[in-house]
Amino acid sequence: MYTLDFDAVIIGGGMTGLAMAGQLGGLGLKTAIVEKQIPEPYHPTQNFDLRVSALSPQSFKMLEKIGAWEHIENMRFCPYRQMRVWEMRGFGDVTFEAAKIGEPYLGYIVENRIVQLALLE
């Protein structure tokens, strides 16, 4: 009988599962990821995906620490300097601006699939 031995098994190879696997791997833990679908490979002429995430500076630091950010840089991303959030049927809204906190950017907009591909590297 063949036995597999892992310190951790992660169910789901989305951005969160893959980021966790990267962090656990950085701690020297042997990690398995269970996922039924691998993201479509990246090609620069592809249309942009509709599913994107606004990555905060902390997310950027984590991706940089586990070696994924350099792969994102080789694909595509876009820094954002301002973000407005509002209620669809309400009157509340808030605007965040990088310049008001003395930063060049608030974070980066990245297609979710590109984050996944970078984490798989």
Label for each model-derived stretch:
Residues 21, 60, 64, 120:
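Short glycine-/small-residue-rich flexible loop motifs, especially phosphate/cofactor-binding loops
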Residues 25-51:
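Glycine-rich FAD pyrophosphate-binding loop
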Residues 46-88:
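N-terminal FAD cofactor-binding segment of flavoenzymes
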